[in-house]
């Protein structure tokens, strides 16, 4: 009787461990898959929207211009973060200097968000009308996933 009970307990423990490992593995797989998909919206859009050669050329020019604009704003954002760090290092309390540096960070971050949205709509305008619904679906789905 003791042998049977020990065996059932061992099998239950093994089953529980395997179930736990399976759940953890599935969670890791799906969370990383979604992060990768969410992180590269640009690639998803290109896969979802069937571009012709003319559209590709137009969009490539728009993408190059946006990449330059993004680099400029990101440089400002890094500089603003540096000023904020300096202000906090000088006086580790809320101060007029920290407030001013915080506002500079917020302006740069807001500029980056606006530039990104302008770029999204410029890209859409470069598509043929029949390709815009697919673009819109991917964009809206990505925004909704990001808000959850």
Curated annotation (Swiss-Prot):
Cited InterPro entries: Metal_resist
Record key words, sorted: Cobalt, Coiled coil, Nickel, Periplasm, Plasmid, Signal
Subcellular location: Periplasm
Annotated signal sequence range: 1-26
Cellular component terms per the entry's GO annotation: periplasmic space
Induction of its expression: By nickel and cobalt.
Residue ranges the record marks as coiled coil: 54-117
Main location: periplasm
A matching Pfam family: Metal_resist
Membrane topology, Periplasmic segments: 28-148
Family, per entry: To A.xylosoxydans NccX.
Described purpose of this protein according to its UniProt entry: CnrH alone is able to activate cnr expression, while both CnrY and CrnR (CnrX) are needed for nickel induction of CnrH. Has been suggested to bind nickel.
Protein name as catalogued: Nickel and cobalt resistance protein CnrR
Organism taxonomic ancestry: Bacteria, Pseudomonadati, Pseudomonadota, Betaproteobacteria, Burkholderiales
Gene: cnrR
